[in-house]
Amino acid sequence: MILLETVIVTGMSGAGKSLAIRAFEDMGFFCIDNLPPQFLPKIAELASASNDKISRIAAVIDIRGGELFDDFKDVLNDLKKGTYNFKVLFLDAHDNVLVQRYKETRRKHPLSFESDGSILEAIQKEREKLEDIKRYADFIIDTSTLSPRDLKEKLFEIFSAQRSRETMLITVMSFGFKYGLPLDADLVFDVRFIPNPFYVEELKHKTGKEKEVKEYVLKWDVTKEFLKKLFDLILFLIPNYAEEGKAQLVIAIGCTGGKHRSVTIAEELFELIKNNGYKASIFHRDIEKDIKG
């Protein structure tokens, strides 16, 4: 009998759970939306007894469940005590992005009745309710800057049947502090102490992926010393995180605008991780935004 694989999809309203569940359908999962958490163990039990007709389940559990959602944490604790093979996926986005999405779709937030119709207040109330649940997440995806296609590709990367379930998913990303911290980062490194190519006229409109910018960023003694210490730390952490059972590791490198220094350092770190035999992906979150350094 195949061990049932279950993905619990949760997170902020407006962060993309509906898009996610459609992506899971495309991957061959049996999908359920707006499932009361108390029903999950029974459904997993029935699926396990289906003679392998159902081997993968994805279920969305969120605050639409009302009072039933209050037992979600207890259900997760009970599942952890059992033999269930499950992962928790938490989708998140910055508050201003969620507000904008609600305005564009003209839909009501599930907690709008508790907040006198204020979308932002409803989002903040939901964030408080989900604070403890987020700690159970095996995977956290910040969808603030992701298109529907980007999100689908990210989910395929994590959950496709071809990916080894024993492999920790490592993502190296660059970002600009002026656009906000990435919500899904496990480790954040600030490289704004490195001399900034933005103030070199011939480099201002290039990115950290281009040779001239790379050479500028990497030539400084402070950069060389930082990379040595960073490489030692990351190569120490990866096997220890994997041993602990961590499923996802997101390493974020930030500079002011996310186009120059952070991009170069992220590229260097990505190559180091690959060259040491680990599977990794790289994502430059803000590289296409207006150049401000």
From Swiss-Prot:
This is Nucleotide-binding protein Csac_1160. ATP binds at G11, M12, S13, G14, A15, G16, K17, S18. Keywords: ATP-binding, GTP-binding, Nucleotide-binding. Belongs to the RapZ-like family. GO terms for molecular function: ATP binding; GTP binding. GTP binds at D62, I63, R64, G65. It comes from the Bacteria. InterPro entries: P-loop_NTPase (IPR027417), RapZ-like (IPR005337), RapZ-like_N (IPR053930), RapZ_C (IPR053931). The lineage of its organism: Bacteria, Bacillati, Bacillota, Bacillota incertae sedis, Caldicellulosiruptorales.
